[in-house]
């Protein structure tokens, strides 16, 4: 009897939560706004502690758009989009389109990712192919966010990774 494969969206959510991520589903833009407000309230953040490197997000939520060494000290949370959501391991593929040339350890410890259901894919190979096919030029900084809870430095596979407190707000495509 053939093995029944779990749908891509279910597999992603299961692996994402297993990695320590916090998942919020939104049917429309109003729910996205409400979820962001709830996250901000839950963590007692101020808007001045939030930043985005995406002009559209910065404008939409009235956030700072610059990210310097000075702003890193007061910045608690980055709000960003992503390239793809990887179902096989529950990770989030980002590039210089979202995080500029910043390394993961240079980003704030708290991150809110805004994504749509059409960004769900099976594996990282599909994600890299998608970036190559959809980009005029391949982004210089491509990485994935996978460790959302404290990593054990004795775990060889997560050595050097920067764990993040990560929220994902997934918007249903209209």
What does each model-identified segment do?
Residues 1-174:
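The feature marks the mature, well-folded catalytic cores of soluble enzymes
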């Amino acid at each position: 009897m053939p093995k029944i494969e779990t749908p891509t969206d279910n597999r992603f959510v299961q692996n994402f939560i297993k990695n320590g991520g916090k998942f919020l589903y939104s049917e429309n833009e109003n729910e996205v706004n409400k979820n962001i407000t709830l996250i901000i309230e839950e963590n007692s953040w101020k808007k001045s502690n939030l930043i985005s490197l995406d002009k559209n997000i910065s404008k939409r939520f009235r956030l700072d758009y610059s990210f310097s060494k000075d702003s890193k000290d007061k910045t608690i949370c980055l709000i960003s989009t992503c390239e793809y959501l990887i179902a096989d391991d529950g990770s989030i593929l980002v590039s210089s389109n979202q995080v500029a040339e910043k390394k993961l350890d240079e980003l704030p410890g708290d991150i809110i990712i805004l994504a749509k259901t059409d960004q769900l894919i099976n594996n990282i190979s599909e994600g890299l192919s998608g970036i190559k096919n959809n980009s005029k030029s391949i982004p210089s900084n491509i990485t994935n966010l996978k460790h959302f809870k404290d990593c054990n430095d004795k775990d060889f596979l997560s050595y050097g990774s920067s764990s993040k407190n990560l929220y994902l707000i997934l918007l249903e495509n209209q």
